[in-house]
């Protein structure tokens, strides 16, 4: 059994007592750090960086050297699964992801292989093992995947989208084909996350970035149903510790009760949700992660501290809160801002845990 020096993050996700509120940042390993840009340049391109275990480890650890973070998150991408399915993923300079072979019909769905995590995605598992070794038990390591719905949006659209017309056309005109794809993706995500857990991640998160573009019934049928299947299929204890599961739907504030009923341990919240309200609605069932608007980091240190204090006050006394941004950190925030943010969370949260 690995002894963790800092268990704050895992304890908060399980709503166990902590000395202060734990904090990490979505996309904490990323383009806002000059050392990340240097490492990416060394790798050549984004996916080469993901596929090199030593470099992926290096960028995972970079933010921990600068800031007093309570967790590390695996440096990877949500599109590793569709890439391993053979869709021809590429990232153009300054562009989002593109797939050379989008999924457009039933035969394309039927022909998709379910990747073996220790074969086609072995580079991710190698990165997990390398990071765990180099962390030396300082903080827990978070693994992650995209949700089936979010992965499907990229696979059907052929890349990023604003209107999601292709996948919504499939959803309304040929729902059986989309359900077939989502079911296959859920199976792939279960295998992938369980392999990450076996390789050493100590908590997992499912990112449903685009669930919020769906109508009420469609969210339950085409997104949440498949995240529920994933939660049911995950390893929940490993190496003497429970392995907490966090679900995050951006724009998902309407569905907190339904999300909390999946059996997950925590819900990620974006900044459109009031934390006090969310706690009143589902705080008896799950922990909550979030939820400062990442754009606050453009503000003065005093304004950042004010926002942190407000969000801590919204959650109030007790455990069950992991402080985070409501989405990924922006790449051009002032260099001092993340430190001000992280230190403020620790400084001002102590009184809520006494």
From Swiss-Prot:
GO terms for cellular component: cytosol. It is found in: Cytoplasm. The keyword Cytoplasm applies. It catalyses: uroporphyrinogen III + 4 H(+) = coproporphyrinogen III + 4 CO2. Keywords: Cytoplasm, Decarboxylase, Lyase, Porphyrin biosynthesis. It holds the Pfam family URO-D. One of its GO terms (biological process) is protoporphyrinogen IX biosynthetic process from glutamate. It comes from the Bacteria. Its EC number is 4.1.1.37. The record marks 77 as: Transition state stabilizer. InterPro entries: UROD/MetE-like_sf, Uroporphyrinogen_deCO2ase_HemE, Uroporphyrinogen_deCOase. Its main location: cytoplasm. Substrate binds at residues 27-31, 77, 154, 209, 327. GO terms for molecular function: uroporphyrinogen decarboxylase activity. Pathway: Porphyrin-containing compound metabolism; protoporphyrin-IX biosynthesis; coproporphyrinogen-III from 5-aminolevulinate: step 4/4. Belongs to the uroporphyrinogen decarboxylase family. Homodimer. Catalyzes the decarboxylation of four acetate groups of uroporphyrinogen-III to yield coproporphyrinogen-III. This is Uroporphyrinogen decarboxylase. It comes from Histophilus somni (strain 129Pt).
